[in-house]
């Protein structure tokens, strides 16, 4: 089938390169180190964020490969939670539960859990999540590492989240976790798996082929590429040399709103496919300052009028797609951006992002609200050991995205699986975030506050006001005079308090109490949601319910 050609082609390339470097790598190297990735979870990364921020040249493209951060992450985490030399206690509360190792191989495995009970005030319902799964990772020899995880879930969510999941836009897609099916009357049943094979071809090249997510930036959110959406197949090639790190990412996405059957397209079945080729070039300007350049192209695999099939031109590994796009008279969706990070002191750093979907410089200067001036920015600040209190971190962030950014006239928008590939709010929003995180020994506490303003579409109105990236931008409200929060202006104040006790740092297994207050006000609705829960969970993954 033609929609599989992209990854069949990439897998053939990967397998040839893999086996070539496999034998040459074993011949020239007798060192053993894991090429597995650090988890993307914000909570997990609070354990090591300060060390990574100050001692790693390149921290933007995530998940970070363990050996690329110049730190022994496992030792750092273990040292922070050591103190009991009892073998059984050490195994249960510090390390993976299953360990198989030899001179040139290592396999680790642990269960993944999220057993949660809660209560929500609007519907006056008891909420719960029942997650069971596993994680397995390891290495064979000095070049090959692997990772796989699987979780199966049943959940009843608080009212605001349940309502969003059931909207036609989301169509039963659980944020970041795939499509669910009905579980009894008001719950969802859903599952998620991920995995990859990692190969260190040399001191300069690392290849990863698998099914997962990525994140570009140093903040809580990303405007370039985030782990907000569901997993996807990918090929990642990371090149590191001197003051440069260059990453190629090729991915396949699905459009759940376009189901192609044998009746209307004889050689396609299932959901419509689209592909992304992305480049990220990071340069270390100094010991304190790092700058990154990002670009991506998304194109469709659909042989209808005005659409492209698989286009080998976008396998070009060299940065700057615009000349390629122009040379083939492309109607595809291109995004470019910058990310910056500056270490102010050994305890603090500034970071920023700038994203351009498309814009006209003359219209931008005239400030007349031209609809196609589609851009956004992020600016953030982190301060570690605030007030000289060890492990107290302050995190501030602002995000701003103009209407219609990331959207397109066809399904080559910047989305996957009914979700946004960048920010969960889509476009036409501003957001201010404050996070205070504190850890002492195994005690883990966090306070998070978000102030959000966005302009949404009106129910029953076919006009797009620029928030929903899946809406055709040709159905816009006007060409000029497009201001921020165009449409149904909505305000959200979201506060979340978490108090936890870490049982095992390897999987960030913790007992956690959570209290959430969400206040939404708009022209049509006013809701005050209060939700609390207690859980036993492996907190390795980001689940973005804070919008």
Protein language model regions, located:
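Exposed, low-structure sequence patches enriched in small/polar residues
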Residues: 33, 190, 284-547
